[in-house]
Amino acid sequence: FNGYQPVGILITDDVIASGIPFSIIGMALIIVVWGFFEGFNYAVICEKINSRYPSKKKWLDYGAITCAIICILFHPFSTSFWGIVEIITTFIAIYGMLMARRQTGNAWGCVFAFCFIWNAI
């Protein structure tokens, strides 16, 4: 399989080549583990930054802005037109995900977003 792999880590090619039942189980395991830890880590990092630098404005969240910038810098991107669109989309997705966590007080939405939505972007 060549091309874009949303959950493309070092073992993804081996998992895909392992046959139908094992590839489905392996990809599900990768998505759940990756989604849980990345979503949960952004929620924790955002909370720590907000406890240190609280904002009085409802829609300004320093932790969410920082996490969105970190997410953009940690993941590969390009400076083409579609690369810029992807950067803007990523910023909106991460900022929105963390603002929803702030409004609801529930970090499980961050895990859900990374398990199901983020891997499709």
Where are these regions (language model features)?
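Transmembrane helix-loop-helix hairpins at the membrane interface
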Residues: 23-121
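Membrane-interface interhelical connector segments
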Residues: 2-24, 51
